Amino acid sequence: MTRKTLAIEGLTATTVIDGQQRVLVDNLSLGVQRGRILALVGASGSGKSMTCSAALGVLPPGVTASRGRVTIDGVPYAANALRGRHVATIMQNPRGAFNPVRTMRDHAIETLQALGKLSSNPQDQIVHCMRAAGLEDVKTILSLHPFEMSGGMLQRMMIALALLSEAPFLFADEPTTDLDLVVQLRVLELLEKLVEERDLGILLVTHDMGVVARLAHDVAVLDHGRLIEQAPVMDIFQTPGHEVTRMLVSAHLSLYGMELNA
């Protein structure tokens, strides 16, 4: 069976620093399949988060996506048609993503409104997605403000809001950053479960090679905005082909007193 594929093709993003053009994402192409997790890794500043932002048309001021397109099964989509409808997103700092004066119910309703999916009785849909994200005491949680919730609860709520879109693809930008190890594991297990049960295709942005080893099927490695290597996760860890990839894997293994085989 052929899986639906989201393809980023020839994506380039640039900015101007001190009068000189600087390329942040350099002619990048990669594909995300439904039912699989592609980890996008690289050193800080390598262009991981910028790739997601450029693909979805949410670049910061002063940055321009000068070329490239995103297709699903070969059909091109404008960025504003992708966001929320075909690609949901979760960010690395959930506390900063929520309006501090609004409850979780407010955020859920506003999400449905933005998606054009608000029905006369949205409660069942909201409850279903929250439970799918591992949130059980739904009535209480919907009444809470962000400052009343832990980082793990907020990350699960962000996943629940993403599920409201029913999008087939998810861009997850450092979803376990700033979470303790136990909560990290629970979030990773949740994402894995959603891939299996909902056939989600996930583009996982992370600097943590432990997360990559635990969750990813395939890995794409960036360096200075360029895709330098892409391979199944086992190949990346056992036989990395590029020196930058070798450095990333070696640094990860050294945390456990291990070395990469020559």
From Swiss-Prot:
Induction context: Induced by low oxygen tension and metal ion deficiency. Repressed by NiCl(2) excess.
Ligand binding (ATP): 42-49
Predominant subcellular localization, coarse grouping: membrane
EC number(s) from the headed UniProt entry: 7.2.2.11
SUPFAM superfamilies per the UniProt record, alphabetical: P-loop containing nucleoside triphosphate hydrolases
GO cellular component: plasma membrane
Annotated ABC transporter domain residues: 6-249
Catalytic activity: Ni(2+)(out) + ATP + H2O = Ni(2+)(in) + ADP + phosphate + H(+)
Compartment annotation: Cell inner membrane
Keyword tags: ATP-binding, Cell inner membrane, Cell membrane, Ion transport, Membrane, Nickel, Nickel transport, Nucleotide-binding, Translocase, Transport
Pfam families according to UniProt: ABC_tran (PF00005)
Topology of the protein relative to the lipid bilayer: Peripheral membrane protein
InterPro entries assigned: AAA+_ATPase, ABC_Ni/Peptide_Import, ABC_transporter-like_ATP-bd, ABC_transporter-like_CS, Nickel_NikD, P-loop_NTPase
GO MF entry, a single one: nickel cation binding
Protein family according to the UniProt entry: Belongs to the ABC transporter superfamily. Nickel importer (TC 3.A.1.5.3) family.
Protein task: Part of the ABC transporter complex NikABCDE involved in nickel import. Responsible for energy coupling to the transport system.
Complexes and interactors: The complex is composed of two ATP-binding proteins (NikD and NikE), two transmembrane proteins (NikB and NikC) and a solute-binding protein (NikA).
Protein name: Nickel import ATP-binding protein NikD
